[in-house]
């Protein structure tokens, strides 16, 4: 009977996703880098939430986002992509002991061999009081003011929930994000309503064509929609706007139907029509899977260990009103389901 580490599970998830020739088509040569550089980030008693991000148009590559829920004190990550992150991890331990449903983590860019320092991510949700201590913990205290100022001027229906940044890059934007209520998504199907929201928040890098594309995608979005904006160092908004359309597929066995003639297929088909995706999106259900194998738990008990990879959302993005290549996001999960003596 084998014991499976988080690093082992991560390798299984990536290799299975890339099997049957899908690796070169979906992830390109960065797959090998993603397999290697993410291993030091597989920390904690529980397997983290791992998101695999790949484009649906253009040269294939794979980026990896790793988000942590509960972490144990004293955990460190030994990676040049996450220098001096100990204070951030200790902050996260304290925040989770005091507040529920808070997560933070890293986004690993493996597209190029140079491997830049990972971006950091924080999801305070409604706990706005956590923004300043997080930014201080990652050595970017001035970013907190940008988030808090932006949060104050957002309409209630466009409230902020999470943000990300590159440390040590003074000119890089702060990415702020939030979830749109269902009623607001339905309202944004009307381009004039969407344009009014953009004017309220101070976003001007759009045209009528972009409004129509955003509205049409919201009309076919299967479930939750979140938005993303870039806040520049002077507090103004950058030229990029994005939405994530959640697939909300409940079970692995439902993936194929969703991508054949269901809600996911309608979203992907629209992205292909707009020139933001090509036929590779049809490989997404083929890469999805769920498996269980016998394994030994850390306490020596025997049980079933599960591996699951499912598509979670697709990102549509516009810069200066021009639609960019869309990206698909898989959620990779692993862990013991049950044990017995």
Which residue ranges define each predicted feature?
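An N-terminal, globular interaction/scaffold subdomain
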Residues: 1-115
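Broad, structure-driven detector of short, well-ordered beta-strand segments within folded domains
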Residues: 48-66, 100-113, 159-165, 216-235, ...
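Extended intrinsically disordered, low-complexity coil regions enriched in Ser, Thr, Gly, Ala
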Residues: 68-96, 126-142, 184-206, 254-276, ...
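Internal, hydrophobic cores of structured domains that mediate oligomerization or house catalytic pockets
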Residues: 84-197
């Amino acid at each position: 009977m084998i014991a499976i580490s988080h690093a082992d599970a991560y390798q299984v998830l990536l290799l299975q996703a890339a099997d049957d020739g899908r690796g070169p088509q979906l992830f390109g040569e960065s797959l090998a880098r993603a397999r290697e550089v993410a291993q030091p980030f597989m920390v904690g008693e529980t397997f983290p939430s791992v998101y695999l991000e790949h484009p649906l148009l253009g040269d294939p590559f794979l980026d990896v986002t790793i988000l942590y829920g509960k972490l144990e004190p004293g955990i460190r990550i030994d990676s040049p992509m996450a220098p001096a992150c100990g204070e951030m991890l200790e902050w996260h331990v304290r925040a989770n002991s005091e507040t529920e449903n808070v997560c933070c983590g890293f986004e690993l860019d493996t597209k190029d061999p140079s491997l830049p320092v990972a971006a950091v991510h924080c999801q305070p949700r409604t706990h706005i009081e956590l923004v300043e201590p997080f930014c201080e913990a990652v050595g970017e205290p001035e970013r907190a003011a940008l988030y808090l100022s932006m949060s104050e001027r957002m309409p209630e229906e466009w409230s902020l929930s999470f943000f990300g940044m590159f440390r040590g890059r003074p000119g890089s934007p702060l990415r702020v994000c939030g979830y749109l209520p269902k009623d607001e998504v339905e309202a944004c199907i009307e381009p004039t309503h969407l344009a009014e929201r953009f004017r309220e928040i101070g976003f001007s890098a759009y045209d009528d064509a972009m409004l129509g594309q955003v509205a049409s995608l919201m009309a076919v979005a299967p479930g939750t929609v979140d938005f993303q904006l870039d806040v520049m160092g002077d507090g103004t908004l950058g030229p990029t706007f994005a939405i994530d359309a959640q697939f909300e597929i409940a079970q692995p066995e439902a993936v194929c139907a969703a991508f054949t003639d269901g809600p996911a297929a309608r979203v992907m088909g629209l992205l292909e029509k707009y020139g933001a995706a090509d036929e590779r999106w049809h490989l997404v259900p083929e890469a999805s899977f769920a498996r269980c194998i016998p394994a030994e738990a850390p306490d020596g008990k025997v049980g079933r260990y599960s591996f699951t990879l499912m598509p979670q959302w697709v990102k549509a993005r516009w810069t200066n009103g021009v639609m960019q290549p869309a990206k698909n996001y898989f959620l990779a999960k692993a862990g013991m389901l049950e044990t017995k003596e």
